[in-house]
Swiss-Prot record:
Positions of short motif RCR-2: 60-62
Cofactor binding note: Divalent metal cations, possibly Mg(2+) or Mn(2+).
Residue ranges, annotated region (Disordered): 244-271
Span list, region Transactivation: 220-229
Protein name: Replication-associated protein A
Coiled-coil segments on the chain, per record: none
Example GO biological process: DNA replication
UniProt short sequence motif RCR-3, positions renumbered to this chain: 100-103
Chain segments carrying region Binding to RBR1: 197-201
Length: 271
């Protein structure tokens, strides 16, 4: 489940919504009807939903949802259905998105009338409330009614051509803030195998012989007076035994010291 911080940073605002449900075997008609009901307050106009097969055999769904009013929500779970969470994107080119959805479907469901958009200026953008609005009012109108990053930049270019040509980077920055890109959910190209071929050994089993131990060959490089591998093995064995004995002696002294300290703290008989 998404954290509260991720929910606060989520924002979807578009009249054309592209949804992908990974690993979802549900019927496209059932998903479409539920999505239609979910966006009833924004007046849905069209939906197409198709089921496709992954290369690993699992099913997934694609859906394009068009509404009369832009869907505005900060709820990242708004399109969750039957426990399936979709990847939510703004359809920048509805024609291409629809073609992509219908490329190789196993099952398809459509409802309503598809609304193609050949340019970002098409659509039912309301007129300006004033006859001669100032620059701030025009910009506020664009921010309120643009439904995608592309449409926002196109409207800015139309209303402020000089500013668009000289300050495009600032408008692109504001467009990215208004319509942030949504990261696609990662799907591993290597599905789990049977039996599991992943290596589950503890890293300690590798560290001990490979990092913490000195090989005879490395010891010979550090000791010019050591000429054979047998001599190196003998020296390393002696040092290992000596180190082990010293550690045991230290543990023994520490244990004895602790006992003696405890005995020294015992209370004597009352006088």
């Amino acid at each position: 489940m998404a954290s509260s911080s991720s929910n606060r940073s989520f924002l979807h605002r578009n009249a054309n919504t592209f949804l992908t449900y990974p690993h979802c075997p549900e019927n496209p008609e059932i998903i479409s009807q539920k999505l239609w009901d979910l966006v009833a307050r924004w007046n849905p106009l069209y939906i197409v939903c198709a089921r496709e097969a992954h290369r690993d055999g699992n099913m997934h769904l694609h859906a394009l949802l068009q509404t009369d009013k832009p869907v505005r929500t900060t709820d990242a779970r708004i399109f969750d259905i039957e426990g399936f969470h979709p990847n939510i994107q703004s359809a920048k080119s509805v024609n291409k998105v629809r073609d992509y959805i219908l490329k190789e479907p196993l099952a398809v469901f459509e409802r309503g009338t598809f609304i193609p958009r050949k340019s970002c200026f098409q659509g039912n953008t309301p007129p300006f409330p004033k006859k001669n609005p100032n620059k701030d009012e025009i910009m506020a109108h664009i921010i309120s009614h643009a439904t995608s990053k592309q449409e926002y930049l196109c409207l800015v270019r139309k209303e402020f051509p000089y500013d668009w040509a000289t300050k495009l980077q600032y408008f692109e920055y504001s467009a990215n803030k208004l319509f942030p890109d949504i990261q696609e959910e990662f799907i591993s190209p290597h599905p789990p195998s049977s039996p599991d071929l992943l290596c589950n050994e503890s890293i300690k089993d590798w560290l001990q012989p490979n990092i913490y131990q000195v090989s005879p060959e490395a010891y010979m490089l550090l000791q010019p007076t050591c000429y054979t591998v047998d001599e190196a093995i003998s020296d390393l064995t002696w040092m290992d035994n000596l180190s082990s004995q010293q550690m045991k002696d230290q543990e023994s002294r520490a244990s004895t010291s602790s006992v003696q300290q405890g005995q020294g703290n015992l209370l004597g008989p009352e006088v």
